Amino acid sequence: MQENQQITKKEQYSLNKLQKRLRRNVGEAIADFNMIEEGDRIMVCLSGGKDSYTMLEILRNLQQSAPINFSLVAVNLDQKQPGFPEHVLPEYLEKLGVEYKIVEENTYGIVKEKIPEGKTTCSLCSRLRRGILYRTATELGTTKIALGHHRDDILQTLFLNMFYGGKMKGMPPKLMSDDGKHIVIRPLAYCREKDIQRFADAKAFPIIPCNLCGSQPNLQRQVIADMLRDWDKRYPGRIETMFSAMQNVVPSHLCDTNLFDFKGITHGSEVVNGGDLAFDREEIPLQPAGWQPEEDENQLDELRLNVVEVK
């Protein structure tokens, strides 16, 4: 009995560390990109998945100790997918005492009508959803729209654009919406998906699966996600290094003439970012940049099968 209590204490300790890490990651992202300001009214887009639940929970937690005042309103888009449990989110949000709005739009029917059987629905579904959320943000008078994309999503987007789009383009932590009226933020930009998954398991969020994109096999994004997970297992630290690279871009050592004036280089020009290392081997650090081994990583893996709620 005493041994079981000790194990529980260790689990609770590790999970508390996990929650603090997520808080720290979100807090750093908010500060680095000035995501939240005094008086902001933030529309938290809640899909019913682990990412958006975690985002809402961490933002609520930070709200209690933040040096500025801001408010949250959770918004869910009921797309009228067959079997969608309409009661889950209202019951959850009312229990928390969170202001919320459920928007009902039959985008599922539109997507099924427009997209041939067997084709991926993500592109059209995303466009429809985005337009509805922008409209809702205006109706609610919100100043920011918060989305639940995390670090792994950002890296996946970078590789998708490189592999299929011929662009080095990721998913920005903060941007102006394509209609030019709303500021979109991604507070989980620095958070690892595996941390979010463990946190969601511990909190036992009432997860609602997506019957559209979640049920489509062989999606390009899923292939990229599997590749990154494989790299993370085989080469610890590689994911952290790649994300660090997105924050440390050197335009003079790429090939985009829009970002750097290559034509303007003449005799007498200044040496930029160390010049050319074409004749020398560049020194690469033995430990991947941005990576630190976790002393309790193995323990956290074990907790996937036996988690307790983080208070």
From Swiss-Prot:
Coarse class of the protein's main subcellular location: cytoplasm
Transmembrane segments: none
Motif placement: PP-loop motif: 47-52
Protein localization: Cytoplasm
Catalytic activity, EC: 2.8.1.-
Record field: catalytic activity: cytidine(32) in tRNA + S-sulfanyl-L-cysteinyl-[cysteine desulfurase] + AH2 + ATP = 2-thiocytidine(32) in tRNA + L-cysteinyl-[cysteine desulfurase] + A + AMP + diphosphate + H(+)
Note describing how the cofactor binds: Binds 1 [4Fe-4S] cluster per subunit. The cluster is chelated by three Cys residues, the fourth Fe has a free coordination site that may bind a sulfur atom transferred from the persulfide of IscS.
Highest taxon of source: Bacteria
Similarity annotation: Belongs to the TtcA family.
Protein name: tRNA-cytidine(32) 2-sulfurtransferase
Organism field: Shigella boydii serotype 4 (strain Sb227)
Lineage: Bacteria, Pseudomonadati, Pseudomonadota, Gammaproteobacteria, Enterobacterales
Originating gene: ttcA
